[in-house]
Amino acid sequence: MVDTSLSVVELFIGFEYNKIDKSVFVEEKIVNELRKEIAIQQKKGLPFIMTSVIIWLLILLVSILDINMNMKNLLVFCCSCPLLPLSWIIGKLIKVDIFSKENPLGQLGFIFTLNQMIYLLIVMWVFSAVPEKMIMVYAMVFGAHLFPYSWLYKSKGYTVVAISIPVISLILGCTLNGTTVAAAACIIEVVFACVLHMELKKMADN
C-alpha cells in the first residue's frame, strides 16, 4: 500500500513538472516569436543606427574645431539632440514606425534606450573632471548601451559592436585623441548599418 502511494505521489509530481516544462516552453516560444516580429518591424533598430552615423560625423566635425575644450564638449552633447527626430525621418524613409506599440517588447527596447541616459551622468562627470577624455567615455557608453539589443533583435552584430566600440574607444582614447575615437565610431556604425541590412535580408530569406 505504501509503495503504491509513493508511486502515485511520484506520478503526480512528474505530471506537475511536465506541466511546468510545457508552460515554460510555450512562454519561451511566444517571446521568441515576439522578438522575431519586432526585429522585422523595427528593422533591428536600423533608423537609430543610421542616425548615429550622422551624429558621430557631427561629433567628428566638432572635435576638429579650434575652440575651447569645454565649449567643444558642450557641442558634442548637443550633437545628440537630433537623435529622435532624425531617427523618425529615416524611419519614415525606410518604412519603420519607431514609435509603434504593436509589439509588447517595444517598450522594453525603449527602456534599453533610457538606460543610456543614466550612464550619461558618468559622461557629465568626465566633462568637468577630465574634459579631454569626454568623447572617449561618451563613445564607450554609447557602444555599451547597444548590448541588450543583441538579445531583443537576435543579432550577433549588436553583440560584436557593443563590445568592440568601448574597447576600441578606450585604446584610441588613451593612445591618441577624441577625434580619432569619433572617426572610428563613425566608421564602425557605417559598417554596422550594412551588417544589420544583411542580417535583415537573411531573416527575410528564411
Labelled PLM ranges:
Residues 36-50:
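N-terminal membrane topogenic signal
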Residues 96-128:
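Helix-adjacent hinge/juxtasegments
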Residues 52-107:
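Selected alpha-helical membrane-embedding segments in polytopic membrane proteins
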Residues 52-56, 112-122, 162-166:
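Core segments of transmembrane alpha-helices
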Residues 120-166:
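Membrane-proximal helix-loop-helix units in multi-pass membrane proteins
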Residues 16, 20-39:
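Short, Lys/Arg-rich, polar N-terminal cytosolic tail immediately upstream
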Residues 158-206:
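Terminal transmembrane helical module of multi-pass membrane proteins
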Residues 80-87, 140-149, 187-197:
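Alpha-helical transmembrane segments and their membrane-interface exit regions
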